[in-house]
UniProtKB/Swiss-Prot annotation:
Database matches in HAMAP family: dUTPase_bact
Pathway: Pyrimidine metabolism; dUMP biosynthesis; dUMP from dCTP (dUTP route): step 2/2
Natural source organism: Mycobacterium tuberculosis (strain ATCC 25618 / H37Rv)
Name of this protein: Deoxyuridine 5'-triphosphate nucleotidohydrolase
Reactions the enzyme catalyzes: dUTP + H2O = dUMP + diphosphate + H(+)
Gene3D superfamilies assigned: 2.70.40.10
Subunit structure: Homotrimer.
Residues at which substrate binds: 64-66, 77, 81-83, 91
Cofactor: Mg(2+)
GO biological-process terms attached to the record: dUMP biosynthetic process; dUTP catabolic process; dUTP metabolic process
Amino acid sequence: MSTTLAIVRLDPGLPLPSRAHDGDAGVDLYSAEDVELAPGRRALVRTGVAVAVPFGMVGLVHPRSGLATRVGLSIVNSPGTIDAGYRGEIKVALINLDPAAPIVVHRGDRIAQLLVQRVELVELVEVSSFDEAGLASTSRGDGGHGSSGGHASL
């Protein structure tokens, strides 16, 4: 089953987002500008495209794994969220995680990948307690942030 995604090319000098391989979940997004990121610095980088995510879906902007592994280029708010009502240019909040070397991003470089997924639009219902709402207690309860066990060496 295929769903279409309307896309506006705001920068005709850049290719449209595309999949590197058949069956890939994400489409590559390209940088619309040259940017140099010093170690630890971040920048909001234009992609030259806007999309109309269908209602009931969400666009998620993820880092490209090769860039993150090889040079430490990632996304500050990973994944970035594109709501169905947003019609502006997709911008990617890049960050250089390398402690020493600057990263140069050139116009036309693939900088992120966009995935479009279905999302459940839940209705929020306030309750005074989970017990009162008939939601059984769980073995986890309110345990979080490491409550399920630590790493053997930490």
